[in-house]
Amino acid sequence: PVWLVADDPQAALDARLALARIGLDRVEGALAGGFPAWRNAGREVATLATTTPRKLAERLKGEGAAILDVREESAFQEGHIPGARHVHAGRLEEKLDDLGLDRDEPVAVTCSVGHRGGLAASLLARAGYTQVSNLLGGMTAWNKLDLPTEKAA
């Protein structure tokens, strides 16, 4: 399930609709008052790591990282980072054990522009993956820099 954090009810509704469009329809509720209310209650706020296309490309040349692409199947087929594994963001939780990812190895998540990737990275972190990052700008930013891609076989 997903819980939303939004500063106002309309923003929560808009987010719920946007998530439903990508197959994430298990929204349980929203935090009234958003982050200010959470912080004012003395609650901890977790953050997720991000990486840029250039940094990720350099990492892949060196120590490496697993790449998880959470876009639609058709977008993945058209071109993805070489060696990337694929699962649609809306099916990540149910398919997680089938992906063969190591919970203690680096995993970089990508989507089209970074929104779904951020959500998927959050789900991975919650599932115990310790070195997760979201690719800033997603495949749009990767492709603008003409970094390597491959098409699905």
Predicted features by range, described:
Residues 1-66, 70-153:
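Rhodanese-like catalytic fold shared by cysteine-dependent sulfurtransferases
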